[in-house]
Amino acid sequence: MFRIKTVKPLKEYKLLVEFENNERRTCDISQFLNIGSFKELRNEELINQVRNEGYSVEWPNELDLSSDTLLRI
């Protein structure tokens, strides 16, 4: 599992994530937006509040995605 250095919200439900190994990925999280509480992330204001929690990214409503998940999408 790689530690996340930075995360930046992009348009169309994407995140720009930089990992500790300096790899950068654009992660499309739209595939999660029809699953349970992740539906809340359809709100652009909420999705833009993403923050780095080290080995995951998290939103104020306590939803999170691990760095492993972000590397797979």
Where are the regions that the model predicts?
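Motif-centric detector for short Cys/His coordination patterns
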Residues: 1-73
